[in-house]
Amino acid sequence: GCIAKNKECAWFSGEWCCGALSCKYSIKRNLKICV
């Protein structure tokens, strides 16, 4: 299944973030997070 650790964005079976609609870039964490 889809796994998005620590709210990071993941792509699995045509969906981002285990069902989240989109992702945004977090400068503070230096990674993309689920929105």
Swiss-Prot record:
GO terms for molecular function: sodium channel regulator activity; toxin activity. One of its GO terms (cellular component) is extracellular region. Its main location: secreted. Belongs to the neurotoxin 07 (Beta/delta-agtx) family. The presence of a 'disulfide through disulfide knot' structurally defines this protein as a knottin. Gating-modifier toxin that inhibits mammalian and insect voltage-gated sodium channels. It shifts the voltage dependence of channel activation to more positive voltages. It shows potent activity on Nav1.4/SCN4A (IC(50)=103 nM), Nav1.5/SCN5A (IC(50)=268 nM) and Para/DmNav1 (IC(50)=555 nM) and lower activities on Nav1.2/SCN2A (IC(50)=1447 nM) and Nav1.6/SCN8A (IC(50)=3504 nM). Keywords: Disulfide bond, Ion channel impairing toxin, Knottin, Neurotoxin, Secreted, Toxin, Voltage-gated sodium channel impairing toxin. Disulfide bonds join C2-C18, C9-C23, C17-C34. The keyword Magnesium does not apply. The lineage of its organism: Eukaryota, Metazoa, Ecdysozoa, Arthropoda, Chelicerata. This is Mu-thomitoxin-Hme1c. It comes from the Eukaryota. May be interesting for the development of therapies to treat the periodic paralysis hypokalemic 2 (HOKPP2), since it inhibits I(GP) leak currents of HOKPP2 p.R222G/W channels.
